[in-house]
Amino acid sequence: MLREENQIFSELFEKGVEKYLRAGKKIWILINKKGHTWGTICHSCGHIPQCENCSVAINYYLLPSGQKMGLCHICKRQYLYPQTCAQCGSSKIKEFGMGTQKLAQLLKERFWAESLIVESETVRSQKKIEKLTLELDNLKSQSKNPIIIWTSLLTTPIKKWKFDLLIFLNADIGLNIPDFNANEKNFYFLYEAFVKHQCPTFLVQTMNPEHYSIRMACKMQKSDFYAVENEFRQAHNYPPYGELCLILYKDEIEEKLFTKVDQLHKELLYLQEKYQLKDLEIYTTPPLIYKIFGKYRYQVVIKGKEVRNFMDIVFSKLQLHKKGFKINRDAESIV
């Protein structure tokens, strides 16, 4: 189902939820963001507050007191909710994105429906799943039928508690990750849910209904997806048609980071030319998250059909481990 750009819920979502609530059916909504909102943005200058230790937006949680607390999901540092912009001083602060808490809030406002939020940590073991099943059974015995909001799919479905409607709220969010395997991960995220969780009805809300990973997952076209994905990977020398190695360096001093990575890049290009390994692509790029726990990060990507042979030469000529580089010789992702 297509969601309009300025809408949180599509028309089909609203009709589906209303229909199943009236019928007393069990609804499961999957949203992969915790908390209340993804972050805040200044409408005067566009500034988005980031964690001081990590280059990610500060997420906000709604406390029982009604106040909001900022939290970095990586280092867990806490922040106060901004009243004015730290960059320009404007008070035009707006929130963006939606987490589990805001979804529960909107469902209550729009449908007068109660929700039960289940975080991913709640279902990491069979014992915790059994505890959750008991909680759901207790709600049922009290004639309560809340909408269940999950932050992750269960690898082992709850056999005793069958849902009538499963909704993927942001089915295309994984496609925003700049990685060669983003399409495959997005496909399997949907496909495996359709296979494992025997819901009578699924709703997939997306801004990209024609994207092949979403379209083919909804139609259960696994072989067709593989054909398209294999063609893409073969054309760009991505695994399994090419090899991929990442060499990561991190430092608290940004200048030192750039100097080290630039020097390594030049040394690798020199070795490539010296040993005439032409079927290689060597370039530098920052990871998806540039700074983590106060350290800046940068990496050298080596891609092609002769990566392993080249890395054997690199190890014999350069003392990378002693210089603080972290090497992933069989990388499955570039972020």
State where each predicted segment sits.
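Accessory helical-bundle/CTD segments and flexible terminal tails appended to RecA-like ATPase motors
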Residues: 1, 125-181, 192-335
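Conserved interdomain linker/interface between the two RecA-like ATPase lobes of SF2 helicase motors
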Residues: 1-43
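Amphipathic alpha-helical transducer elements in NTP-driven molecular machines
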Residues: 6-14, 39, 48-51, 82-85, ...
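Hydrophobic/aromatic residues located in beta-strands of well-ordered beta-sheets
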Residues: 27, 115, 202-203
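Conserved helicase/translocase motor-coupling segment
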Residues: 29-99
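Short hydrophobic segments within beta-strands
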Residues: 30-32, 118, 205, 250
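Conserved RecA-like helicase motor-core motifs
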Residues: 52-53, 59-61, 112-123, 276-283
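Long, charge-rich boundary regions
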Residues: 72-162
